[in-house]
Amino acid sequence: MSPYDYRLEKGLISFLNKVYKKNKTLYEAAMKKIEDIAENPYHYKPLRHDLKGRRRVHIEKSFVLTFRIDEQEKRVTFLDLCHHDSVYKKR
C-alpha cells in the first residue's frame, strides 16, 4: 500500500477513459506515474505563481500530470493530464 492515498478528479477520469481507447501507451505511463507519485509525492516539482500549491510531472515528453498534496489527509489529488502548452495556458 502507498504511503499516500490518492484520488482522481472527475475530469481526469474522463480524459483517462478516452486515452485508454486511443493511446494505451500514454494511459499505462500515466497510471504507473500515479502509483509512483503516491509513494513519494514530494519528489516532483512544485509549481509557482497562479499554480502554486500544485506539483507536476511530465509523461511522454509532451504531457503534464498535475496534482496537489493534502498532508493532513495523507492524500494526493490528481487534477489534470494535458498537453504541456495547455497546462500553462490554464493559469
Residue ranges: model-predicted function:
Residues G11, Y42, K52, S62, ...:
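Residue-level recognition of oxygen-bearing side chains
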Residues K32-H58:
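A short, surface-exposed loop/turn module that caps and links secondary-structure elements
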Residues R7-Y42:
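N-terminal first-folded block
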